[in-house]
């Protein structure tokens, strides 16, 4: 590992329609092969679908969904004397957000509906309602941490 100074975190510019940094981060993760305009149109169409189906502000549903998917704990492998333990550790806020966004996009892509905008809208609405695959992933992560609570003293 290089012993140089810490790399500064690049600022995220807010998106054009909602003026939100969260939406901008989501668009960047959703983007494939540098096609940002395609990613933007997918997310904005998903927001239109959410507005149509729920009648709520799509940004509120989006933020609620992210809050419901963000994990608080995760397990990290730690090798102690020949055996590997799954040690539960708390997650810092930036990683919580990154994991939540990654999980939501991943599970939206694997949904059965037709069209990414419909898939993403469905996953966002499910996550906002405390159901869906991404919320289950968070629950599974927390269960793993709870099951390995005995190894918490191996934290570093």
UniProtKB/Swiss-Prot annotation:
InterPro entries: Ribosomal_uS7, Ribosomal_uS7_bac/org-type, Ribosomal_uS7_CS, Ribosomal_uS7_dom, Ribosomal_uS7_dom_sf. GO terms for biological process: translation. PROSITE patterns: RIBOSOMAL_S7. One of its GO terms (cellular component) is small ribosomal subunit. GO terms for molecular function: rRNA binding; structural constituent of ribosome; tRNA binding. Part of the 30S ribosomal subunit. Contacts proteins S9 and S11. NCBIfam families: rpsG_bact. Belongs to the universal ribosomal protein uS7 family. This is Small ribosomal subunit protein uS7. It comes from Desulfosudis oleivorans (strain DSM 6200 / JCM 39069 / Hxd3) (Desulfococcus oleovorans).
């Amino acid at each position: 590992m290089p012993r140089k100074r810490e790399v500064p975190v690049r600022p995220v510019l807010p998106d054009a329609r909602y003026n939100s940094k969260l939406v901008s981060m989501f668009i960047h993760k959703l983007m494939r092969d540098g096609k940002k305009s395609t990613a933007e149109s997918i997310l904005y169409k998903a927001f239109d679908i959410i507005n149509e189906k729920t009648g709520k502000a799509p940004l509120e549903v989006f933020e609620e969904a992210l809050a419901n998917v963000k994990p608080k704990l995760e397990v990290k492998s730690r090798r102690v004397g020949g055996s590997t333990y799954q040690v539960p550790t708390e997650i810092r806020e930036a990683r919580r957000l990154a994991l939540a966004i990654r999980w939501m996009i991943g599970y939206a892509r694997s949904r059965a509906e037709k069209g990414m905008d419909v898939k993403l809208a469905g996953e966002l609405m499910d996550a906002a309602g405390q159901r869906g695959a991404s919320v289950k992933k968070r629950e599974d992560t927390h269960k793993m941490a709870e099951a390995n609570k005995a190894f918490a003293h191996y934290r570093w």
